[in-house]
């Protein structure tokens, strides 16, 4: 299956066509750990462990089990080429990965087929998911800083959760430090990411994110920052949420 150079994908209120085009151009490089997606590959083990551990605490599973997510339905919104879908499928989850970029979905399907993983990939948006579908775990990882309406997007995510489910969101804080590190440093100095990958004014502070979630009857139960240590040349989970951060939310009791 060849990847097409352009594919507009579906249109919905939360989708920015410019953002789709931007990431569609990178579709063939998603699985290259040394390519333009290298930063995502480097933080991926931390994302996986954070989500896995949060899910195991919530659903009372043994995180050390190779099938710790067995029987749980997971929706990965903005899944790209499946960097999260594949490991969680291996842990037993029933994963649906959605992305508005047809080229990303094509890349995801090719890679999953090679690995013989039964992942349900769909070129669609969160607004187009059947409202009768419900998920134990909803992921919105590095997505909300690319949508046009954060509140509407999160509301739709919340509506797709099972009553006892969790939502995990990863994004970038909006302050001088995130501008210096995530844009100037990552895109212009270190060139870890293509220039224009992020727009600083679309970053979301933890307080803003929590306010949105509260509006949909949800509370934040866990949170963590992701920090790069240049001396050790590695990323780690941290209480420092000034730049990259993740939160776990669930319906308030």
Swiss-Prot record:
Mention one GO biological process in which this protein takes part, according to its record.
Answer: methylation
Instruction: Report the EC number(s), separated by commas if there are several.
Output: 2.1.1.222, 2.1.1.64
Record bears the keyword S-adenosyl-L-methionine: yes
Question: What metabolic or biological pathway is this protein involved in?
Answer: Cofactor biosynthesis; ubiquinone biosynthesis
Concerning Pfam families, the annotation shows: Methyltransf_23
Q: Which domain of life is it from?
A: Bacteria
Catalytically driven reaction(s):
a 3-demethylubiquinol + S-adenosyl-L-methionine = a ubiquinol + S-adenosyl-L-homocysteine + H(+); a 3-(all-trans-polyprenyl)benzene-1,2-diol + S-adenosyl-L-methionine = a 2-methoxy-6-(all-trans-polyprenyl)phenol + S-adenosyl-L-homocysteine + H(+)
Residues recorded as binding S-adenosyl-L-methionine, renumbered to this chain, are 47, 78, 99, 141
Listed A to Z, the keywords are:
Methyltransferase, S-adenosyl-L-methionine, Transferase, Ubiquinone biosynthesis
**GO MF term (any one):** polyprenyldihydroxybenzoate methyltransferase activity
Provide the top EC class: transferase
Stated family:
Belongs to the methyltransferase superfamily. UbiG/COQ3 family.
- Its biological function? O-methyltransferase that catalyzes the 2 O-methylation steps in the ubiquinone biosynthetic pathway.
| Protein name in the entry | Ubiquinone biosynthesis O-methyltransferase
Q: Which organism is it from?
A: Rhodopseudomonas palustris (strain HaA2)
- Source organism lineage? Bacteria, Pseudomonadati, Pseudomonadota, Alphaproteobacteria, Hyphomicrobiales
């Amino acid at each position: 299956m060849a990847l097409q150079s352009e594919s507009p994908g579906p249109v919905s209120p939360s989708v920015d066509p410019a953002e789709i085009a931007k990431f569609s151009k990178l579709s063939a490089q998603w699985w290259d750990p040394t390519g333009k997606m290298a930063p995502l590959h480097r933080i991926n083990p931390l994302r996986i462990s954070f989500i896995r551990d949060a899910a195991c605490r919530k659903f009372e599973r043994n995180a050390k089990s190779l099938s710790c997510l067995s029987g749980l339905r997971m929706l990965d919104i903005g899944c790209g080429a499946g960097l999260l879908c594949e490991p969680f499928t291996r842990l037993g989850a029933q994963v649906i990965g959605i992305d508005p970029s047809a080229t990303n979905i094509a890349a995801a399907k090719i890679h999953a087929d090679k690995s013989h993983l039964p992942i349900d990939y769909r070129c669609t948006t969160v607004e187009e998911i059947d409202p009768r579908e419900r998920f134990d775990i909803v992921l919105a990882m590095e997505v909300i800083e690319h949508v046009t309406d954060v509140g509407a997007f999160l509301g739709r995510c919340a509506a797709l959760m099972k009553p006892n489910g969790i939502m995990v969101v990863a994004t970038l804080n909006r302050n001088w430090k995130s501008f210096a590190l995530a844009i100037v440093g990552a895109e212009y100095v270190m060139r870890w990411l293509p220039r224009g990958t992020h727009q600083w004014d679309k970053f979301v502070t933890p307080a803003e994110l929590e306010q949105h979630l509260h509006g949909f009857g949800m509370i934040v139960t866990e949170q963590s920052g992701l920090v790069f240590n240049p001396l050790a040349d590695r990323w780690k989970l941290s209480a420092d949420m000034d730049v990259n951060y993740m939160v776990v939310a669930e319906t308030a009791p």
